[in-house]
Swiss-Prot record:
Keywords: Cytoplasm, Hydrolase. It is found in: Cytoplasm. Heterotrimer of UreA (gamma), UreB (beta) and UreC (alpha) subunits. Three heterotrimers associate to form the active enzyme. SUPFAM superfamilies: Urease, beta-subunit. Belongs to the urease beta subunit family. This is Urease subunit beta. PANTHER family: UREASE (PTHR33569:SF1). One of its GO terms (molecular function) is urease activity. One of its GO terms (biological process) is urea catabolic process. The keyword Cytoplasm applies. Its EC number is 3.5.1.5.
């Protein structure tokens, strides 16, 4: 064995993430002048306002990528991403404090409206 090597039992098949959870695909554009990086568990509804997309549709969703990973949006870049719904109690605290409690029941504070993304 080589130091740091991982040996995986191929008979077990592929590991599937977020099986059975609601997902959505979304087009996102960075209208800002700096790169923006979003981590795997960041509440997508509350990301940097320079990212333009259907923000209301992302309430209660995060990136559908492995834990600890991130996606970087370069200035002027548009990319298609996949989001996955938060599970468990669906309580969201922190970030920009737009949701402070259960995402299904909470009334959000004001986040600047996005320009229509073309």
């Amino acid at each position: 064995m080589i130091p740091g090597e991982l040996r995986v039992n191929d008979d077990l098949g592929q590991i599937e993430l977020n099986v059975g959870r609601t997902t959505q695909t979304l087009s996102v554009a960075n209208y800002g002048d700096r790169p923006i990086q979003v981590g795997s568990h960041y509440h997508f509804y509350e990301v940097n306002e320079a990212l333009h997309f259907d923000r209301e549709a992302t309430k209660g969703f995060r990136l559908n990528i492995p834990a600890g990973m991130a996606i970087r949006f370069e200035p002027g870049q548009r990319r298609t991403i996949e989001l996955v719904e938060f599970a468990g109690k669906r309580e969201i605290y922190g970030f920009q404090a737009a949701i402070m409690g259960n995402v299904d029941k909470h009334i959000t504070t004001t986040i600047p409206d996005d320009k229509e993304v073309k």
